[in-house]
Swiss-Prot record:
GO cellular component: extracellular region
Gene that encodes the chain: pgaX-1
Phylogenetic placement of the source organism: Eukaryota, Fungi, Dikarya, Ascomycota, Pezizomycotina
Signal peptide: 1-22
Entry function: Specific in hydrolyzing the terminal glycosidic bond of polygalacturonic acid and oligogalacturonates.
pH-dependent activity: Optimum pH is 4.4.
Location of the active site: D245 (proton donor), H268
GO terms, biological process: cell wall organization; pectin catabolic process
Cell wall biogenesis/degradation listed as a keyword: yes
Superkingdom in the source lineage: Eukaryota
Molecular functions (GO terms): galacturan 1,4-alpha-galacturonidase activity; polygalacturonase activity
Protein name: Exopolygalacturonase X-1
Cited PANTHER family: EXOPOLYGALACTURONASE X-1-RELATED, PTHR31736
Main EC class the enzyme belongs to: hydrolase
S-S pairs: C247-C264, C392-C398
Amino acid sequence: MKLSHLLTSAVSVLSLGLTVEGHFSRSRNDAVGPKRPFKPLPYSHPRKKVCHVRSHGDGRDDSAFILSALKSCNNGGKVVFAEEKEYTIGTALDLTFLKHVDLEILGRIQFTNDTDYWQANSFKHTFQNATTFFQLGGEDVNVYGGGTLDGNGQIWYDLYAEDPLILRPILFGVIGLHGGTIGPLKLRYSPQWYQLVANSSDVLFDGIDISGYSKSENEAKNTDGWDTYRSKNIVIQNSVINNGDDCVSFKPNSTEILVQNLYCNGSHGISVGSLGQYIGEVDIVKNVLVYNISMYNASDMARIKVWPGVASAMSEDLQGGGGLGSVSNITYEDMYIENVDWAIEITQCYGQKNMTLCNEYPSNLTISDVYISNMYGTTSSARDPNIGTIVCSSPDVCSNIYVENIDVVSPSGTNDFICTNVNESLLQVNCTSG
């Protein structure tokens, strides 16, 4: 059986939602597969106490009930959100004090649509103006149950269309968590990114079901599935993502990241970056393995995006360029694509439309030891006759980029690549320009 058939079969199970049922296994390492984490994940000890979260059930803020239950069952307990109940959160919750506690979410949690409150009180992070409804952190924390977190995103999609400088909260903020499991869970209608994983380590995401599109003419933008930032030894697996931006994005200083067994639809691919955005900052992404991915109706599959060495403006609320750093030991292996604009995109001119200026100011960030292999499927007509682009801003900042066994064609049957400032002898593709 061809790899594409294997991937499609695996994805059909995911798309039915079967992976979001079940319960948490305390042996995190046994749950990871088929590829193993870069380092063993820590063991989670049994819980000895149970706390049930109360709910008003009428849309009033349940944050006080949630906080009370978490404090009562912290250090060795389990907090249960009942299946038949709906919970409302209207207060920014700092949950970084958690230790040795489980959150079993069986019901539905919805965040209020008070945009003025959330812009003023959500948790602010310096990178790319990120904000979160809440921040969950601490040590040995597990969140599971198959229930739903709803970000009430529609009001934010419409508001962002009017004002691109508003601060839209991220639905699920994992901030400073060391040892934990997230999933199975359903995440719906995030105002911005669905999950930010920052300053964290040894965390497994397993069985996450992401979906939520705009119901108006205003698109749901920047709805990344995951963004890892200043984090290490993170595993993301067995999940279904229907969104409108990166399926997974490895932001600055993400190391030892394993991503496997994902179905991504409507996304911008699985991306390293963007990196090099801030002058004076050193961005490092290394030791990343992406394995067994099905990508549909997307702009990219395998993507590395680096800002040039000169100030650039991607949009009014996203500007940068001139930062330092490196990308190294990145592997993409076994991928199936349908209707994807670029099978592979590597650029060091992210955000800069003036290519002459970009070439005059090459990126300060190097890319080395990249391995992309075993990709099957078809691209969209958007870039036909090209199916990929590997463009470095200077031959001095890219080395050891290997591409092999790419069985992908455009709608017209071509398989051309744009190749610039890269060692073409390491690329088993049809480079037609450079």
